[in-house]
Structures are given as C-alpha cells and as structure tokens.
C-alpha cells in the first residue's frame, strides 16, 4: 500500500550570513579535504564545511582503511600523487600507515605472504595470486589528525557540525550555500562552491542534471583481541579447514569481499569491510536505518561464531562499528562529459585530463555541471555512468579530483573567468608543479616517495 504524501508550507525567513569566502567546499571527506587544500595553497580564502565532528568522510568515519586504486599495473607506477601521497606519508611518519616497499611489489612469495592480509595487492589483475602493489593501510584517527593539521597549515576556515541544506543560486550562478547548525540556519557566501558531499547534494539542490544510482551498503567494523599470526598460520597450514570456516563466516555476514578481515597498523586490531547489503538506497533515511540495524545483527552473529570456531579469534571483541554508513553510489552528476565503462577499460586519455586513477584518466569536464555556473563537483558523485563509477569510486582518485577542483576554483578567481572557462593547460601545469599527476603526460612517474623506499615502514606501525 502506497503511503500518501503530505506537505506543509513555511513562511519565508531571513537567514544570517555566517561567513564569506572565495571558495566554499561542502563535505570534508577525501575529495573535499583535497579540494580545500588545492584552493588554499593557490592563494584564495577557503571555508570547508563538514557535518560530523571530524574530517575524512568514508576514509575515517566510514573506516575504509585501505587506500588502493592508485597503482598502474600496466606502467608499474604510482598513478595518484599530490595530496594523497602527502597524507599517506604523514600518517606513516606517525607509525599509523603501512605500505609495501618498491622492492616488494610483484608476486614474490615472501611479499605475498607478508602483505596479502593487509589488502595491499592489485585486485584488478586477472592473475592469481594478485600481485603486491603500492597501497596503504591506515588508522582512521590518524587520518583525522593529519587532516586537521593540513587544514590548519593551509589557513583553511573549518566549520564542523554544519549540515548542508540548500544551494543559493541566482541567474544560474551559485552564490553560496545554506547550512543547518545548532545555532540555527546560516548562509555561507562564496564566489565558487565545490560539491564534495558524495551524494551530489549541492549540485542537485542547484538543479544540475543527475542520474540516480544504487550499489550495496556496508556497515564496516573493527575487531580487537585478534591473534593475526595464529589466524594466518591456520589459513596457511590448514587450507581445507580454513576454507570451510571462511565460507560459513561469509554466509553469516550475508555479503563480503574475498578477504573479510584485514590487518591494521594497530596490533591485534583488524578491520572488516562488511557486511554488504543489497537493494538499499544510500540517501533514503528508511534504508540507511535498515542497513544500520541489519548490519549490526550480522556483525554480532559473526563475532559469536568466530570466537568459538576460528583460530586467532577466540578472544576477539568489537572495537567499533563505523559511525558513517558505507555508501558507494547514489546520485551521479550528468556533466559536460560523462565517463563510461569503455573510457576506463580502454584507458582513454583526454586533452583536458586533470586526474588519474588506477590506469585511467579523468577529464576536467566530469567536474562541471551542465547548467550551473560557479560550481564544481569532486568525489564519487562525479559525472559518470553507474558502471563506470563502480570502477572509479575509490578514495585516491576522489582525492585527485578534489585537488584538481580546488586548483581550478582558485585559477578561475585569479584569472577572472568562470570555472567552466578555466584554462585547462594552465590548470594541468599548476597541478604538476605542485606534485600531482593530472594525466596530461603519458610518461611514467619513476620516483617513489621516500617512505616507500624505507626498510622500516612496516615495523614502525
């Protein structure tokens, strides 16, 4: 039976202008953080709005604790650099991020044995076992800490506990955003707005065309008290018994990737990118509530089972369940160019490429709404088909898009043009000069971050 919709009307109200800036970034996840840094580094005043009490989005609040999709197996190079590598290196310096050294990349048995349970392998390859590659496992609170340090370092005005409500738009041009806070409704005015919400909240509110998308939801969790050495030894020495138990765990979870648990930099703590739940909408309050309730039931049933059956997990306990639901796909921008699965599969290079993912390139046009000016979009809600987005939604390419969007916003203001008319050649040049790889050149990135060469990266964690 269909529910009858009811509506109310509210009188027009005056809204306090809480702040003004050159650029407002809505959403403090990976793309939003990178966008704010990219803009501020290039000399404009930036306000960063975030709904939670921390930065990081799905990286920290969602506890997606593996940074992958930044290694080009065809060219054997690190393909996402810039702000992403800065963040990784700073977390590693704290002993709270680990990744394989350059001499460990590949399918050497010792490397596979050491790194597979960290998730540091190229899961896109068709060969088994998947080769070890450059990928980083990290701690969520390390991300929060380093993100705050970077925001303060670049003079970004941070406004936490600010929920986006509505886009301010006049004559097709975005003028700022309306937020809800504990102090009431507030207006934040800006010359350029960057939508880094993950769900296209700002662009959709402004009337930009989009397509609805849907993919599985996940309530990620961490377990403590795990003897990972014993667990790996059982997996290695009793493969048949392990396979039977592993199959039952996945049945109880209701959905997971091949490896349902992975190591973290914290001793005895593993993270579990599961349970996966299908058929739910990531912007529906009812569906999100269902996911939280259903997910926790799967988690607690799984813990009860592995305590009694799985070597290494006898004394495990739930450390935490991610405070942010793992949403992979909702609204997708239909921008000046729409990325396709074919673009990704064929590794199409574009003249206006401004970011790279694993082995694919992203043109500037995928950040541009069709009908709205002074607005850029960066993150998993970029302009792509549903299938293409599923292949390109990981954190590193989202950070690369964000960095490009931030630099583009600054460049537009400094040259007196709209973001739609930014000189992309100049944008590419700035990105490359500041350590990013916009994908404008086909040459390899031969240099490796200093910490990737170090012998003690893993041992410091």
Locate predicted features.
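Core beta-strand elements of the Rossmann-like FAD/NAD(P) dinucleotide-binding domain
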Residues: 19-21, 183-192
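Short hydrophobic core segments
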Residues: 26, 188-198
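Extreme N-terminal leader/targeting segments of oxidoreductases
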Residues: 1-23
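Mobile, glycine/GP-rich and aromatic-enriched active-site lid/loop segments adjacent to catalytic centers
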Residues: 104-137, 141-145, 149, 153, ...
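Flavin (primarily FAD) binding-site architecture
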Residues: 195-208
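N-terminal Rossmann-like FAD-binding beta1-loop-alpha1 element of flavoenzymes
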Residues: 23-46
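Conserved N-terminal/central alpha/beta ligand/cofactor-binding core
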Residues: 2-4, 20, 45, 51-166
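Conserved beta-strand-loop-beta-strand element in the redox core of flavoprotein oxidoreductases
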Residues: 168-187
